[in-house]
Structures are given as structure tokens and as C-alpha cells.
Amino acid sequence: MIVYLFPTEMEAKAFRRLCPDAEVIISGVGMVATAAAIASLDRRKHLVASDMVVLAGIAGAYGEGVAVGDVVEVVSERCVDLPERFRQSYLQRVFHTKLRRVASNTIHAMGVEAEGAEIENMEGAALFAMSEVIGFRAVEVRAISNRVGESFDKWHLDEATAALAEALKRINDGE
């Protein structure tokens, strides 16, 4: 079983058009909403090791290493909003796509430093944490919509969500 988890309907819309039969869940934005959505999914479906939950959405890029419109697989996440001694990192040991692999920060506050990450998002660490607890396969796919710190009116949402949908279709088709 593959379930596609999106923080918002806006991020899911183009994928729903390309893959209308795919199982899509809108989790809500942030780590708490994502963890709750996965817990609810597990309660209903009893996730097992062969099940895959694909968290997909937009992300911001630090610096110039990843271009706006690029689609990447996140292979490590750090919770950087917490005080240093409580920060948790998650590392993906099995890769599920042919996409470029990047490190990410999961954040909820402005002004967080990259510290080795190439992108940032608001949900990824929750996916990896829940995967460790429950035991399903976790895949995080992000399309770059903006540079970190850019004002929202400069984000390339249509371009990013279209690229995301195409990449997810390839995953859904087994490519």
C-alpha cells in the first residue's frame, strides 16, 4: 500500500489530477498535524513494514545548491526549533526514488540557520519519527518553491506543485 500525505490541498491538487486513484490524505501543516494524521492512518489501516507513506509538498531552499522547481528526496531531517540539547535528527537508510537526495531542517520559526541542510520544511521530521515508531517505509519528496527568507509573493507555487506531481506520478507508476 502507498499513501500520499500532503500538508495542504494546494500541494496535492496537481497530483490528484494526474493520479486520481491514488490514496491522498491532507495532514495539515506542521509536525503535530503530520504526526496526528499518521497516527490516525495507522489506527485505521494498521501500517506494516511493506506499507509506504510518501510525504510530499513544497520546501524552501537555502543558498543556490537546489534550484526553484527542483524535486528532491529528503534523506535526513533535523528538528532545529528545539534547544540544542533536545534536537533530534532522523536519517533515511533506504532510498526509494531516483531523485536527488538532500538534507533538510524541519522548522516552525523564521531565522533558522541551515547548518548543513539544503532545504527546509515544516513536517518531515514527524514522518521519520513516526516511521521509526510504527515501522512503515517513509519517503519524503519536496519540490522547491522558493529560497528561504523570500516573501510569499515571490514563491513559485504553480511551478513547484506541477513538478512535484510529475515526480510523484513516476513513483506511483513504479518508475
Residue spans for each PLM region:
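Glycine-rich phosphate- or other oxyanion-binding loops that anchor nucleotides, phosphorylated ligands
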Residues: F6-E175
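Extreme N-terminal starter segment of soluble prokaryotic enzymes
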Residues: M1-V3
